[in-house]
């Protein structure tokens, strides 16, 4: 029997406006790319493996094939490969729950760049974030600094960012050039929306002070054969997508 999270979905063709917006700003939100039932299934699978306080879970897809399918879905891969103009590979996955009324709910991530972790010298990594429930400021959505991806990897202070202390603010802390400070943009997402972030786009997130959880399923991609740091916790490695 075919699983709910499968590869039987059409490719997605970006419009010229969408393509240009991403390359100018370093991010884009694709509306309603995932169905409510797909989002519910992703969240359900992660909840089955969650610990009491719902800390982040890394690379569960390597044990749960149905989650690994999400990395390889044509409607996702087609977008990634169009944006990097090349064949891509998957690198890692992560669920950030921000589960309401838990010790990790109110964590607000410092402004950081994902590529500070990946360490790809050419800026050829992208991370998708699938909103498994609605995400808004009060329940911990992300904010971005448009155009900051053009700066390359900025200097940063390395900080613990996985299984960190409860109530702490994780994320490598960077010094953002002043010209971006007035352009902070909150990303309000509906269930099923997918955010795509350039690896060098500076971003952070708010804490969750509500009764509404904010689970985001994140998957990182890289230009096939690109250089990256494996990482002690992330254990990144290339996965074929075709």
Task: Explain the meaning of each model-derived region.
Residues 1-120, 232, 236-242:
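Non-heme Fe(II)-dependent double-stranded beta-helix
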Residues 2-8, 12, 44, 52, ...:
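Non-heme Fe(II)/2-oxoglutarate
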Residues 35-36, 65, 96-98, 135, ...:
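Short, solvent-exposed loop/turn segments at secondary-structure junctions
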Residues 86, 115, 130-141, 149:
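Active-site region of the double-stranded beta-helix
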Residues 93-95, 128-130, 217-221:
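A structural signal for short, well-ordered beta-strand segments
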Residues 107-113, 168-183, 213, 232-237:
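Short, surface-exposed loop/helix-turn segments at secondary-structure junctions
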Residues 123-127, 139, 184-186, 214-216:
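Extracellular structured ligand-interaction cores
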Residues 138-202, 226, 240:
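Double-stranded beta-helix
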């Amino acid at each position: 029997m075919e699983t709910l999270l499968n590869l039987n979905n059409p490719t997605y063709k970006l419009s010229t406006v969408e393509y240009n917006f991403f390359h100018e700003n370093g991010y884009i939100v694709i509306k309603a790319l995932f169905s409510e039932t797909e989002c519910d299934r992703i969240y359900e699978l992660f909840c089955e493996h969650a610990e009491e306080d719902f800390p982040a879970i890394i690379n569960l897809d390597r044990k749960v094939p149905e989650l690994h399918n999400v990395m390889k879905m044509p409607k996702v891969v087609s977008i990634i490969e169009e944006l990097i103009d090349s064949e891509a590979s998957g690198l890692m996955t992560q669920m950030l729950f921000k589960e309401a009324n838990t010790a990790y709910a109110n964590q607000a991530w410092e402004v950081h760049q994902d590529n500070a972790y990946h360490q790809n010298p050419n800026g050829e990594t992208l991370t998708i974030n699938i909103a498994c429930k609605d995400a808004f400021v009060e329940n911990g959505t992300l904010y971005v600094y448009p155009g900051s991806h053009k700066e390359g990897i900025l200097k940063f202070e390395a900080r613990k960012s996985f299984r960190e202390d409860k109530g702490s603010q994780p994320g490598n802390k960077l010094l953002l050039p002043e010209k971006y400070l007035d352009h902070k943009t909150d990303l309000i997402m509906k269930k099923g929306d997918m955010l795509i972030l350039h690896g060098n786009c500076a971003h952070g997130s708010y804490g969750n002070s509500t009764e509404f959880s904010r689970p985001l399923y994140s998957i990182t991609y890289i230009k096939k054969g690109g250089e990256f740091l494996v990482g002690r916790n992330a254990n990144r490695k290339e996965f074929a997508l075709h």
